Amino acid sequence: GGAGVGAISAEQQDAGSAKGTPVTGSLLIGGLTPCNVIPDEILTDHPKRFRAMLVECANPAHSLADSARMRDALASLDLLVVIDVALSETARLAHYVLPVASQFEKAEATFFNFEFPDNYFHLRRPLMPALPGLFSEAELHCRLLEALGELPAEPIAALRAAWKEGRQA
């Protein structure tokens, strides 16, 4: 463990002038913890260490620079939940795996903003229905938040009704 590249000082953290990770003080990138710092954020003996993770459609146990250390870190978590279409190396370490519909069974969207000033938004309809009991990631998130009592039912019911009604393209 310890302060890594891009770490911020305790004074900066205390002053609130820079946002860093709770254990190593590594700078957040776009508000996110840098992937290669996560093992230290989990394995370091620190009161604010990461104890649980939700991994969505990613395989950090296999795809990062020191995957053996990441596997050790993930295995040491009190709770690891993986949302994925595949039973990846990370999913095999999880306490819970929440399967989701594949890219062919759900609507997906991509926003291309690298062609400024002409930006493009691509929406693709599902090619086939999802298997029973499988949802898109968005639907799964919504159901998790509802189950936790963190999502008011009223706006979601209206959105679901509009979604079911649909409209002609």
Predicted segments, located by residue:
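Non-catalytic alpha/beta scaffold blocks inside enzyme catalytic domains
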Residues: 1, 10-168
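Long, K/E/R/D-enriched contiguous segments that form extended
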Residues: 6-8
